[in-house]
Each structure stands twice: as C-alpha cells, then as structure tokens.
Amino acid sequence: MKKYFTSAFWGLCFIIFTILVKVIDVQALGAEGSLIGFAGLNTAVFKLLGTNHFAYLATQLFGVLAILVAAVFAVLGFLQLLKRKSLLKVDREILMAGIVYALVIILYVLFEKLAINYRPVVLDEGLEASYPSTHTMLILTILGTAIPLAGKYIKNPKLALAVKLICILIMCLTVIFRLISGVHWFTDIIGGVLISLCLIRLYKALL
C-alpha cells in the first residue's frame, strides 16, 4: 500500500483544502452575489489579473487536445484487445490509463453538479460551478499520464522527449492561462492542481 501513499496524500490535501474553501472568509462577492470562499484572496487576485479572452480560448484548445490524446490511447487499447482477444492482455499502462480517465469523467460530472464556488464571471450558460477547475484537472491528468505513455510507445527517443516536453509545457500554460483567463477563482485552480496530482500519482501507483 506504500505506493499509494503519495496519491492519498494529495487526495487528502484536496479534501482539506475543499473544506477550507467552504468555511473560510465566505462572502457574497461572486457573480450575481454568489457566495465564495477565501473571498478576500480570490477577489484580490481576480482584480489584479482581470480577464483574458485569448487565454480562455487557448485553454479550451488545450482541453480538446487532451481529449484527443486520451482518444489515441483508447484506440490503441481497443486495437490491442482485438488482436490479443483478451482484456487482460492489453498493456497494463493503457488499462490503468483507462481507469484514471474514467475517474476524470466521473469527477468532472460530479464537480459540475456540486456548487462549491461559482465562476467570477457569467458565461453563456449562466452561473456555473467553478471549484475545482475541472478543465485544469482534465488537461493536467490526461497529459500527466501521457508523459510515461509517450516514453513507452514512441520509439524515437528524440520524438518521445519532444512530446514529453510539449505535455509539460501545455500543463504549465493551462494553470497560468486558466487563472488569467478570469473564468476561475485562484482557489479553483489550486483545487484543480491538487486533484490532478492525486490522479497522476494514482496512475503511477497502479502500474
């Protein structure tokens, strides 16, 4: 069970931080008077950074890219299943990635329904739940698990390294751009990073 310790640690950090978001400095300072935790900190960061439409569009594109990456490994796993005629014979790295991707989907839907914090701005779909940043969670988790997968399935070392570096770059840009885009509070991003670390470490523990 030691191999799950790091994942459990980040998961616990996420739970504790979420509780703090619900109870510390909760004020009706959000969009349409919605309640937000860490109100002083969140509103100060939002006023400092404002909104950035380019950053928002970039993270939307990163999200599509992450889904395509997940789809590539899903297709690879399906082809292995057809060829080897047994789910147990599909590479463990791909099977475990599938489990983590399933968890991402479940958590994505769950957090969209649980309104812990609302967005600082109202988008086309009206007032939306914003904690944690599920966009950040999706991109970081998928690309974070893609890094070891790239090392295994891309035979050209230079190409594999390039793909890994691109994944890391996009992960970093996602955190920065999602924050400066203005569609999330600062604590939303922190929550998204914490749950991503939990899922990425879980994937490594499952291998």
Per-segment meaning from a language model:
Residues 8, 12-16, 95-110, 141-145, ...:
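Hydrophobic, lipid-facing residues on alpha-helical transmembrane segments of integral membrane proteins
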Residues 4, 53-63, 91-96, 157-164, ...:
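Membrane-water interface of alpha-helical transmembrane segments
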